[in-house]
Structures are given as structure tokens and as C-alpha cells.
Regions:
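Surface-exposed amphipathic alpha-helical segments
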Residues: 24-34, 120-145
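Sec/Tat signal peptide C-region and signal peptidase I cleavage site
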Residues: 14-20
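Short secondary-structure junctions
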Residues: 29-40, 75-88
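Short, surface-exposed coil-to-beta transition loops
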Residues: 40-44, 53-55, 98-107
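Sec-dependent N-terminal signal peptides
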Residues: 4-14
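Short, solvent-exposed coil/turn segments at beta-strand boundaries
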Residues: 29-31, 49-51, 64, 88-89, ...
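Signature of long, low-cysteine stretches enriched in small and polar/charged residues
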Residues: 77-114
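A short acidic-to-branched-hydrophobic micro-motif
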Residues: 43-71, 117-123
Length: 145
């Protein structure tokens, strides 16, 4: 049991140092996010609550941009998802898909830190109105950025 606990702490310690210093991994965990993957080029986290299913990916790259990520996600989306449309608001590029649920993928337009791109994917039972969607985007970006 002691070896298991020691191994767990070593793994968690290694995971905690993979993201750049400016990423508050512990802060994300305190907000209920589970860190799934933490590499030098990306960090993937999930948050599952009774009402929400949220996936966050932070990409660390000086070569790409938000529009590139938007196109990449659209091309690589699972075939079970039907692409409905894409649009933007003042803070993000937004893609809307339909599977069993409505899936929204948002890519922040502005980088708080140069070379760190924030993408958030979340699901909803019903299609959101523009007003509700903008509210949700603001809440999620404020929480993650």
C-alpha cells in the first residue's frame, strides 16, 4: 500500500510540472477539473458535474493560431457528430455539433499568455440561444483563463 501511495504521488508530481509555470494546474484541480494529460505541448482537463460535461485543452505553441485550431477541430471531430455551424462572438470562435447532445467547441480568440491557446468543449441537452451561449462562454473562459 505504501508503494502504491508513493507511486501515486510521484506520478502526480510529474504531471504537475509538465505544463508551463503560468498554468495554474492546482487552481484548475481546486475548481473541480481532473487533469487527464499534461505534456509540454498541451494540457487536457475534464470537469464532470451533475449538469455539466466540460473538456478543456490548453495548447502551447508559438506556431499555431486560434483559427488554425478551429479548422483542426472541425476536421478531426468524431464522425458521430454532425457539424451544424460555426460563428464567433467577441471572445471566441464557436463550433456547434449535434450527436446525442449538442456539442459546442469554443476557441478563445485572445491569448492571455503568448503561445497558450484555450479550447473548451461542452455538451448541452438543448440547443442554447445566442444569449445563453454567450453567458456560458464568458463563465467558462473566465474560469479557465
Amino acid at each position: 500500500m505504501k508503494k502504491f501511495i508513493l507511486g501515486l504521488f510521484l506520478i502526480l508530481g510529474a504531471v504537475s510540472i509538465a505544463a508551463p509555470e503560468y498554468v495554474d494546474v492546482k487552481g484548475m484541480e481546486k475548481k473541480g477539473y481532473i487533469i487527464y494529460k499534461n505534456k509540454k505541448d498541451s494540457l487536457v482537463a475534464f470537469k464532470i458535474t451533475q449538469n455539466d460535461r466540460i473538456g478543456v485543452t490548453l495548447y502551447f505553441s508559438d506556431k499555431d493560431n486560434a483559427e488554425y485550431l478551429t479548422n483542426t477541430f472541425k476536421r478531426s471531430a468524431p464522425s458521430a457528430l454532425k457539424f451544424l455551424d460555426e460563428f464567433e462572438n467577441n471572445r471566441a470562435y464557436i463550433q456547434r455539433f449535434k450527436g446525442e447532445l449538442y456539442i459546442y467547441n469554443i476557441i478563445a480568440k485572445e491569448q492571455k499568455v503568448n503561445g497558450c491557446y484555450v479550447t473548451i468543449t461542452f455538451s448541452e441537452i438543448d440547443d442554447l440561444t445566442e444569449e445563453k451561449l454567450n453567458e456560458k462562454i464568458d463563465i467558462l473562459l473566465d474560469e479557465v483563463e
